[in-house]
Amino acid sequence: MRKRRPYVIVYVTSSVDGKIASRTGDSRLSCPHDLRRLHEVRASCDAVVVGANTVIRDDPSLTVRYVRGSNPIRVVIDGMLRSPLNAKLFTDGQARTVVYTSVLSPRGKVNELRKRGVDVYVLEPMNSSGTLSLTKVLEHLYEVVGARKVLVEGGGTLLWYFFKERLVDEVRITVSPYVIGGEEAISVVEGEGFSSREEWVKLRLKNVKLCECGNEVHIIYEVVRKRMIRELP
């Protein structure tokens, strides 16, 4: 029997060449209007999900600031618990924070986060690198945490695993008028990638909007499931 999971939205802002940050980690791509759009989506979701690299690189708060609305549950997927203890998510007390990690993570760090009121769930990893099954994470988010709609903001490695496990329902991407370039720059989706067209994740266009700034484009896609592919022209 297939277990239930939340509806998953991916929201990213990228350069024209598909990068979300430069090789030095500079990710300042969004205009004020795009930030407002992001926060509107954030406010509409029960939880917002990021990976360890985003916590380490950006130290985000993941709260709702540019629009009115409640803060979502902040979820960190960090199989080896590499996120620093002084990260805003663990210290600012702005919203509930949930961490999914593996049995390979330092026990002392798990205990310290729990003392601070962070909900830490320890799962069995899929490999020695601490990679977690996102399918199991989403099932837990639905059944135990109570999240029905979640927003995944990255980074590129986490997005790869979400797409690899076929867990994304909707993709929202803002294309910003920059070219970043570089093999070491961070792409929208990192990871090993799919090897053939049969494996690619197919999308269906739902909406295209010129940003109010006049220089960015916001695109909304829905992910096409196998049963839907036969219906497409």
Regions found by a protein language model. Give the residues of each.
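Enzymes that bind and transform nitrogen-containing heteroaromatic metabolites
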Residues: 1-233
